[in-house]
Each structure stands twice: as C-alpha cells, then as structure tokens.
C-alpha cells in the first residue's frame, strides 16, 4: 500500500508518512 511507504515518501501526493 502506498500509505505504508516510509516518511521520506511524504513529499508525494497521495502518500501518507509513517510516524
């Protein structure tokens, strides 16, 4: 899932950063 990507992916739309 794109929402499971690491926080460095937070810069991309649709991606949720993992805290």
UniProtKB/Swiss-Prot annotation:
Tissues in which the UniProt entry reports expression: Expressed by the venom gland.
Domain of life, per lineage: Eukaryota
Any GO molecular function: toxin activity
Entry GO terms, CC: extracellular region
Protein name, entry field: Protopolybiakinin-2
Functional note: Shows a high potency in mast cell degranulation (is 10-fold more potent than bradykinin).
DNA repair in keyword set: no
Miscellaneous comment: Negative results: does not provoke rat ileum muscle constriction and does not show algesic effects.
Keywords: Mast cell degranulation, Secreted, Toxin
Species of origin: Protopolybia exigua
Family: Belongs to the bradykinin-related peptide family.
Subcellular location as annotated: Secreted
